């Protein structure tokens, strides 16, 4: 398969103003996507975005490109990414587009596409779009230009959908929940859903100004959430990322609960209810503790490449209904076709109520191995992963771990960084080896 030039593991992403996230490129991208999607019978595209200031500009030029190819666009305004997956299906649109850079800073943005089934578009469609990008933009005749419309009740539709995944027989009455919406797409929706289900909600990170998305808040920085949970004597804290497709939790003692622990809680609860189909899909980054804890329950576990699209592909291949990344992307195919932070949070809250247990106690049966993750920003186009220095450092680290741990070093599919992950039984050893490899990467980049 031909290597893609622009599309990464989660669409196209970059710094606004730098290629490819420029008005000129996004206009051409809209036209190219329109040409490809039109060949598949498309005539209506749903477009959503998060709260970045650049979203308004990119939304306009993206629509102009689509319209020039003869496709009409339906705008939702700021809304979580999983809402677009849901709306694309329910409104019978031929595709959905989200303008977002997920957990990245405000100065980044991106474009990702959803198919008519509400899943990420396949590689073949992305390659077809890239092929059109190399051609001259030719506008359709005036009578065939695409139009624009808006969905005024998009948020209400998604709120009703999320609430519908929560059993009517239980309530969140008596639970105090602190939510950190990262000044992003969930800032109105998540607090309202929790309140309507009976919880007492304390909301932070809900004052987006276009430039504070993910800034010292949300899944990338849970310190404020931890502090507020303790200060409010809350039962639980929930942090979303900028576009709402991932979620991290904090228990009543202020301890972080990551994606591995979250998926363990959900899988065990489904098993206890007799609703678990197959097993759980994780990634190469999933903690060994998750695998061993699921094994003790008799729940199968398999790993796939890092990226929620690969998790979903493996779920569809096996017929399993639960998959997740430890970063907090949780896919529950019984409810939605992509990672959905709000729905994943509701499933954990449901487990708390069903078992009459705190989040802290629900995590007691999963013992995570010490894991150290270091991100190294690349300053050149040279790939340090082929460096003999880095290769040697990895071999030394593997010998030190002596088959009692794992090393994973890879280039991010969404950012220009190298991720170094070391996992083992001894926390000090894990930290030392991760720093050792990271230093080798820095010296080689």
From Swiss-Prot:
EC number(s) given by UniProt: 5.4.2.10
Gene Ontology biological-process annotations: carbohydrate metabolic process; peptidoglycan biosynthetic process; UDP-N-acetylglucosamine biosynthetic process
Co-factor: note: Binds 1 Mg(2+) ion per subunit.
Keywords annotated in UniProt: Isomerase, Magnesium, Metal-binding, Phosphoprotein
Binding site for Mg(2+): 102, 241, 243, 245
Record-annotated disulphide pairs: none
Gene3D superfamilies xref list: Alpha-D-Glucose-1,6-Bisphosphate, subunit A, domain 3, Alpha-D-phosphohexomutase, C-terminal domain
Functional note: Catalyzes the conversion of glucosamine-6-phosphate to glucosamine-1-phosphate.
Family: Belongs to the phosphohexose mutase family.
The protein, known as: Phosphoglucosamine mutase
Biological source species: Baumannia cicadellinicola subsp. Homalodisca coagulata
Name of the gene: glmM
């Amino acid at each position: 398969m031909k290597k893609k030039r622009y599309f990464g593991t989660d669409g196209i992403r970059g710094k606004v103003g730098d290629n490819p996230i420029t008005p000129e490129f996004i206009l051409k991208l809209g036209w190219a996507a329109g040409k490809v999607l039109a060949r598949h019978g498309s005539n209506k595209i749903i477009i959503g975005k998060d709260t970045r200031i650049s979203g308004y500009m990119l939304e306009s030029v993206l629509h102009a490109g689509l319209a020039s190819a003869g496709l009409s666009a339906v705008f939702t305004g700021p809304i979580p990414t999983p809402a677009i997956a849901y709306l694309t299906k329910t409104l019978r649109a031929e595709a959905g587009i989200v303008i977002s850079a997920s957990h990245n800073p405000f100065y980044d943005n991106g474009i990702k596409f959803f198919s008519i089934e509400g899943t990420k578009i396949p590689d073949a469609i992305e390659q077809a779009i890239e092929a059109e990008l190399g051609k001259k933009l030719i506008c359709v005749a005036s009578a065939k230009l695409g139009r624009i419309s808006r969905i005024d009740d998009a948020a209400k539709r998604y709120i009703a959908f999320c609430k519908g995944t929560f059993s009517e027989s239980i309530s969140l009455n008596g639970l105090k929940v602190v939510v950190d919406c990262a000044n992003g797409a969930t800032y109105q929706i998540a607090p309202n859903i929790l309140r309507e289900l009976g919880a007492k909600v304390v909301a932070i990170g809900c004052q987006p100004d276009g430039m504070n998305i993910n800034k010292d808040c949300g899944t990338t920085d849970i310190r404020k959430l931890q502090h507020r949970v303790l200060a409010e004597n809350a039962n639980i804290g929930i942090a979303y990322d900028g576009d709402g497709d991932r979620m991290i939790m904090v228990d009543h003692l202020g301890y972080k609960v990551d994606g591995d622990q979250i998926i363990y809680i959900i899988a065990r609860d489904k098993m206890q209810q007799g609703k678990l189909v197959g097993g759980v899909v994780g990634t190469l980054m999933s903690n060994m503790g998750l695998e061993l804890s699921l094994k003790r329950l008799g729940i199968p576990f398999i790993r796939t490449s890092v990226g929620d699209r690969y998790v979903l592909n493996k779920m569809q291949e096996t017929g399993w209904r639960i998959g997740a990344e430890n970063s907090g992307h949780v896919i529950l195919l019984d409810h939605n076709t992509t990672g959905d932070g709000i729905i994943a949070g509701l499933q954990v809250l449901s487990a708390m109520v069903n078992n009459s247990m705190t989040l802290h106690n629900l995590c007691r049966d999963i013992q995570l191995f010490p894991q150290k993750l270091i991100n190294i920003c690349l300053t050149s186009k040279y790939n340090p992963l082929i460096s003999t220095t880095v290769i040697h450092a990895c071999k030394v680290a593997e010998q030190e771990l002596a088959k009692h741990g794992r090393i994973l070093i890879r280039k991010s599919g969404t950012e220009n960084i190298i991720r170094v992950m070391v996992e083992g039984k001894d926390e000090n050893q894990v930290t030392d080896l991760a720093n050792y490899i990271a230093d080798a990467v820095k010296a080689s980049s």
